[in-house]
From Swiss-Prot:
GO terms for biological process: ATP synthesis coupled electron transport. This is NADH-quinone oxidoreductase subunit N. The gene is nuoN. GO terms for molecular function: NADH dehydrogenase (ubiquinone) activity; NADH:ubiquinone reductase (non-electrogenic) activity; quinone binding. HAMAP family: NDH1_NuoN_1. It comes from the Bacteria. It is found in: Cell inner membrane. The keyword Cell inner membrane applies. It is a multi-pass membrane protein. Belongs to the complex I subunit 2 family. Keywords: Cell inner membrane, Cell membrane, Membrane, NAD, Quinone, Translocase, Transmembrane, Transmembrane helix, Transport, Ubiquinone. NDH-1 shuttles electrons from NADH, via FMN and iron-sulfur (Fe-S) centers, to quinones in the respiratory chain. The immediate electron acceptor for the enzyme in this species is believed to be ubiquinone. Couples the redox reaction to proton translocation (for every two electrons transferred, four hydrogen ions are translocated across the cytoplasmic membrane), and thus conserves the redox energy in a proton gradient. GO terms for cellular component: plasma membrane. The keyword Transferase does not apply.
């Protein structure tokens, strides 16, 4: 029962917060501050009561499950602070439903991370998916938001059906839905269980869809463009980190010498994700669509670590995802500070010459872009170096060379952002009142990207 305490606590926090937000409608900001404080305290609860030496999880990744959940919750709290300050910045009403949806989404991620059963894993991912559809369509009067959310919902429903179909295959050919039992079946020397492998592949479609990897990526640019930037920040950080942890958690089931079909399939997915993400972003003018393709590219990098099938590879994948999530939070936060209400229309034109008026913000965006390129001594360089080094060390030369090549290609559009800020024709930007929560997040992002490599080395 204590192992479920983090999930129960977050659910109660979300529901109680929503109750008081409805009963006292004019105090949403005060309620949101209290909820954020309670969530910060919940990090310690999550770490304490999720921290058991689960043989399955520790054997797969060597990372404590309590740490994993705490990381996801921390990034969710940051997303909540960004939404709170964004609503103040644009003088908009803070809708507490947004925070409730984020918290319930995290509960789904927690359930998925803790599960050792395919059906429970599916339920956790579906709770996350349903709340994500609502977050994507939160701009009720915006046609693009509604269109993106509808695409997201329809494709997500289709993938969920495939995932359930896969679970039926797994149960039919494996006789169980427990991870340990299925792993035992896959290790059985009686021959390749093709039906079981097909079931696992079908189930994986749901995870790859939520990770935005090729070929289940077509929804990403439209959803990112139409969704509120606060939703995109959550999708790109807490949600993606959670799904990466889930994928690592079941890595022993999907990759092994006894069924190379899965390995080769994921290898193709990783290479195509890197190529499509790198080249697809080149002609984009919307910064949100640019980050959508950047996400596809970086998920391809993360899959390199998964394919290495050892603890060093898993750690490299999770570390890289954390570094990318921090960078994307910094980028979106800077756009909010610069553009306010117009942030969802952010493009290269809207940031032209901003270095003249906002030197600090331009410097932060530049550091984020250089880190995403992988320029030393920024943390992004060490994340990529560690990942590619492990790939070369395991003689995965195709993955490493593809990663290096696409990093060079991606440098073009990352540097294009820097060029627009410093070398393009200047446009005057209205200075908005500073929100100290957003400013603090930016300072923390810069500190991590500049000094994170020293922290990581220890």
């Amino acid at each position: 029962m204590l192992l479920l305490l983090p999930e129960i606590t977050l659910t109660l926090i979300a529901l109680l917060g929503q109750f008081f937000a409805v009963m006292i409608p004019n105090k949403n900001r005060i309620i949101s501050n209290i909820i954020i404080l309670l969530c910060i305290l919940s990090i310690f609860l999550t770490f304490k009561y999720s921290s058991y030496e689960g043989v399955w999880y520790s054997f797969a990744t060597g990372i404590n499950i309590g740490i994993s959940k705490s990381i996801v919750l921390l990034f969710t709290i940051i997303s909540m602070i960004i939404y709170r300050d964004y609503s103040i910045l644009v003088a908009d009403e803070l809708k507490f439903e947004f925070i409730t949806l984020m918290l319930l989404s995290v509960v789904g991620i927690f359930v998925a991370i803790s599960s050792r059963n395919f059906l429970l894993l599916f339920c956790g991912m579906e709770l996350t998916a349903l709340t994500s559809y609502a977050l994507a369509g939160f701009k009720l009067n915006d046609m693009k938001s509604s269109e993106g959310a509808l695409k997201y919902f329809i494709l997500g429903s289709l993938v969920s059906c495939l995932s359930l179909f896969g679970i039926s295959f797994i149960y039919g050919f494996g006789g169980s839905l427990q991870f340990e039992d299925i792993l035992y079946k896959l290790n059985d020397n009686s021959g390749m269980n093709l039906g079981l492998i097909i079931g696992i592949i079908l189930f994986l479609s749901s995870i790859f869809f939520k990770l935005s990897s090729v070929p289940l990526h077509f929804w990403v640019p439209d959803v990112y463009e139409g969704s509120p930037i606060t939703s995109v920040t959550y999708f790109n950080a807490a949600s993606k980190i959670g799904m990466v942890i889930v994928l690592l958690n079941i890595s022993k089931l999907i990759i092994g010498n006894y069924y190379p079909i899965n390995y080769n399939l994921i290898k193709i997915i990783a290479i195509l994700s890197m190529l499509f993400g790198a080249f697809g972003a080149i002609r984009q003018t919307s910064l949100k669509r640019l980050m959508a393709y950047s996400t596809i590219l970086n998920i391809g990098y993360v899959l390199i670590g998964v394919l290495l099938h050892n603890q060093e590879g898993y750690k490299a994948a999770l570390l890289y995802m954390l570094i990318y999530a921090v960078g994307s939070i910094g980028f979106f936060t800077c756009l909010i500070i610069l553009l306010g209400k117009d942030v969802d229309k952010a493009s290269f034109k809207t940031i032209q010459g901003i270095a003249e008026y906002h030197k600090t913000i331009a410097a932060v965006i530049s550091i984020v872009m250089f880190s995403m390129i992988g320029i030393p001594p920024l943390t992004g360089f060490f994340g990529k170096y560690y990942l590619f080094y492990q790939a070369i060390n395991q003689e995965e030369f195709a993955l490493a060379y593809c990663g290096i090549f696409t990093s060079v290609v991606a440098a073009f559009y990352y540097l294009k952002v820097v060029k627009a800020m410093y070398f393009s024709k200047k446009i005057e930007i209205i200075k908005l009142p500073m929100q100290y929560g957003l400013l603090l997040i930016n300072y923390l992002v810069v500190g991590f990207l500049l000094l994170g490599s020293f922290i990581i080395s220890f």
